[in-house]
Amino acid sequence: MGQIHGLSPTPIPKAPRGLSTHHWLNFLQAAYRLQPRPSDFDFQQLRRFLKLALKTPIWLNPIDYSLLASLIPKGYPGRVVEIINILVKNQVSPSAPAAPVPTPICPTTTPPPPPPPSPEAHVPPPYVEPTTTQCFPILHPPGAPSAHRPWQMKDLQAIKQEVSSSALGSPQFMQTLRLAVQQFDPTAKDLQDLLQYLCSSLVVSLHHQQLNTLITEAETRGMTGYNPMAGPLRMQANNPAQQGLRREYQNLWLAAFSTLPGNTRDPSWAAILQGLEEPYCAFVERLNVALDNGLPEGTPKEPILRSLAYSNANKECQKILQARGHTNSPLGEMLRTCQAWTPKDKTKVLVVQPRRPPPTQPCFRCGKVGHWSRDCTQPRPPPGPCPLCQDPSHWKRDCPQLKPPQEEGEPLLLDLPSTSGTTEEKNLLKGGDLISPHPDQDISILPLIPLRQQQQPILGVRISVMGQTPQPTQALLDTGADLTVIPQTLVPGPVKLHDTLILGASGQTNTQFKLLQTPLHIFLPFRRSPVILSSCLLDTHNKWTIIGRDALQQCQGLLYLPDDPSPHQLLPIATPNTIGLEHLPPPPQVDQFPLNLSASRP
């Protein structure tokens, strides 16, 4: 898991779409074993090949890397062939025996010797998805021998997440690394990869210097099993058979963190201050947690905690500690002294900033004296002429050339009655005339539909159903009808009708009118384009042709009541036999109390 020499913005290349994360980690793990390290071009060619392989039928789960290698074209660019060959070489066959489960060892028996590792034990097997989720760290059972397992990407990410909130060399940092070393039994190569993944290049260089110093001292002092003729300690620690030397190298690698030179800048825990209203015990608890995570291992914490508990406290707690003489007392005395302290209620004071006097210089916008330019009502002048029309009086955003041209509405014909009395202008309720055209625009008159007592508002229209030739007919304009009604004679051939319930003046009916869900075109005399309806009512008795609100709302019209020149006539009112309310239920028999009880008083 060494560094990748390239220009990739992230240390982990992104997986191609459609490929599982654990499969992509297997390919990355094999690519990182190449010498020299893979480049960005190699990862780009690997992603391109995997995108093509995902579309083939041999892409199964688990992946057969032998079949996958047969798909690589001859002379394919990059190092894809080497990466696939590493996976083919280390692929676990389905018939391989399962790993033996370590049995618990009794105190009276001696532990069995560990099986001899294979010569290629440093090569990790392909990643297998675990059946149950496990959390880092995982400790081995007591007495069970630890088996070497190289790092996987998810292991390195888990370790880095654990130490991300701890300072370098702190107890939490060192405890996490000890658990990782105890669990994975890493070699010298694995420890170097872990160091490069967790720390910066400067820390890696300093750790390398301290580790070389400790190794030289250990080789001079002598170690059990160390043979100077077999090579340096780092090389002998990579041998899986040398368990003792590997343990010694791991301890030296951990000890190199405690001997790193301290940081020159102030640590983060030195900047922790007590708030104005923060309790003293909460402030000391924050200091204690920060020192546990930030102090190097072996550094005494108690004197630093006592010093910061006084120097970083607020002024009121410092005055209390000074008055009691506990500026450098044990921490328990300081906590008991300040435990009864509570922040005083601060008197709220309204701070009003006085307004600056107006300037004596003239405003650069309007040239007047007595106000600031930000308060000037004059708009900001443009810096120069408009680049579109060369007019210096407006900005480019206000240029009239940028405004879209106004679309002219469709001219409507005028359908006025022939009587001369209807052409007189009428004054509206709040002033103005009936028609007030703009002087700069053409007059566009909406259709006027008269309503007279002598005759019904009937228009001559043409109706086309299902793309047939429009047929002329007389239609009644009814603003109280929700849907348009046409007779069945206008519909050519048999069509599919739907039952519907109609509520009219004479009650409910579900036999005379049917619902026709067929496109309908209505040609009105005052409109050039036809009115298109998706459905309408069909009169099976062929009595009614009604233009309802669904058609009238598409053509903006105006209903008016013309003046009747004849004198008014008083006619007797005859109550009809059926008024259309017979279908409603009878009203409830409930006594009605007077709304105003005070009105019934004498």
Swiss-Prot record:
Residues 94-121, 399-425, 582-602 are annotated as: Disordered. Keywords: Aspartyl protease, Capsid protein, Eukaryotic host gene expression shutoff by virus, Eukaryotic host translation shutoff by virus, Host gene expression shutoff by virus, Host-virus interaction, Hydrolase, Lipoprotein, Metal-binding, Myristate, Protease, Repeat, Viral nucleoprotein, Virion, Zinc, Zinc-finger. Residues 473-551 form the Peptidase A2 domain. A motif (PTAP/PSAP motif) lies at residues 94-97. The keyword Ribosomal protein does not apply. One of its GO terms (molecular function) is aspartic-type endopeptidase activity. One of its GO terms (biological process) is viral translational frameshifting. Residues 97-121 have a biased composition (Pro residues). The active site is at D478 (protease). HTLV-1 lineages are divided in four clades, A (Cosmopolitan), B (Central African group), C (Melanesian group) and D (New Central African group). This is Gag-Pro polyprotein. It comes from Human T-cell leukemia virus 2 (HTLV-2).
